[in-house]
Amino acid sequence: MTQWEVVIGIETHAQLSTVSKIFSGASTAFGAEPNTQACAVDLALPGVLPVLNKKAVECAIRFGLAIGAEVAQKSVFARKNYFYPDLPKGYQISQMDLPVVVGGNITLQVGQGDKAYEKIVRLTRAHLEEDAGKSLHEDFHGKSGIDLNRAGTPLLEIVSEPDMRSSDEAVAYARALHALVRWIGICDGNMQEGSFRCDANVSVRPKGQAEFGTRREIKNLNSFRFMKEAIDFEVQWQINEIEEGRKIQQATVLFDPDTGETRMMRSKEDAHDYRYFPDPDLLPLMIPAEWIARVQGEMPELPVQRRERFAGDLGLSAYDASALTASQEIADYFEAVVAIAGKANAKPCANWVMVDLAARLNKDGKDIADSPVSAAQLAGLIQRIADSTISNNIAKKVFEALWNGEGATADEVIDKQGLKQITDTGAIEALVDEVLAANAANVAEFKAGKEKAFNALVGQVMKAAKGKANPQQVNDLLKQKLAG
């Protein structure tokens, strides 16, 4: 039976965070009334000329530096010719033979736990281009409306090599790229508004075969979950087609989230179908070394550098370091917690940020920037766990109280609610003696080899202590008494 290998390459359109469009002064703000943010250049009125947005070029330079690519000192804009109702000029200004960014790579963390591994995905190129307008179909009863607000919005199209071999790797790549463009401040990453959208080129081939299979491009994937579902379906569809003796035809397909299936949109075009040629209205883009050096000096610490620091300086696992650098806001919050709680508590700090805080933020639909529990408050809570003032279970109650604004600090909540842990050995021993005397059956079961009986006794002691006894001391004292 043939063993199949999946081959995936991804093209990503990242909308650049500029105030105005790439070749005009019209606003890029999202959500305005249709056709209220389209000027003469965007409408392609006769006689208008494009003027390149300097900020868009700087965004491209930042990206190139972030992925270790070559930032071309000379690049050329080209006309990509095709007809579509929401493309007024009849062509899109893009780049073809001489893009602004060439090469580079992104390092991914794929999977979790024992199955986690690191993978490097190479990038082919990244080039600047303008977005098209938008066709609206819902409200026009057999007709289509055209909204040109989006026309001319600056995009950076990022093209990967076909280095991914599973939907998990593709999603890990998309997540890493999404985090990076947000981290370096060139794109807000809002997938619902179309600021970050991916096309996945998918093919299959027999394992061991060097030649690529025929690819089909899944267009406009605007969520990581849909990306995984779409690729998984497409892979199985292609395998079934080949095994039933049919040939795969190169095509562009769409993913339907309602059915979980891909459906053909059109046969796939090649570059020659677009008749690219240099745009005569735009001079070649020249980027001097001094400009690149200036942008380099303004670059923040990158996610990969921060991951290495978290792993090296704080002893975190590769998975934890990767999760904590999913966004700059998360990484900054975590570092602020560690700065107060101390490096010795780095692992519990990581756990609280990644698990408890993340779950509560997700439940309430909040971003970490809007967390009701500040980094200082969380650090204070972790310090009280570390010095045995409270147990982990009690800490969860304190966290909820802080979240709900029931105290300014962990200490205040602990004092107000009388949650301080009982660490007095004599007091805990008295509770243990009471529980052993009242639970002879559990004692007998434990001595007969039933480990569950021990857990039941621990639970009884904690219940008697109203959850405030030090769990380790309870365990130790029970073992001593039962061994005697």
Curated annotation (Swiss-Prot):
Keywords: ATP-binding, Ligase, Nucleotide-binding, Protein biosynthesis. It is an enzyme of class 6 (ligase). One of its GO terms (biological process) is translation. The keyword Chloroplast does not apply. GO terms for molecular function: asparaginyl-tRNA synthase (glutamine-hydrolyzing) activity; ATP binding; glutaminyl-tRNA synthase (glutamine-hydrolyzing) activity. Allows the formation of correctly charged Asn-tRNA(Asn) or Gln-tRNA(Gln) through the transamidation of misacylated Asp-tRNA(Asn) or Glu-tRNA(Gln) in organisms which lack either or both of asparaginyl-tRNA or glutaminyl-tRNA synthetases. The reaction takes place in the presence of glutamine and ATP through an activated phospho-Asp-tRNA(Asn) or phospho-Glu-tRNA(Gln). This is Aspartyl/glutamyl-tRNA(Asn/Gln) amidotransferase subunit B.
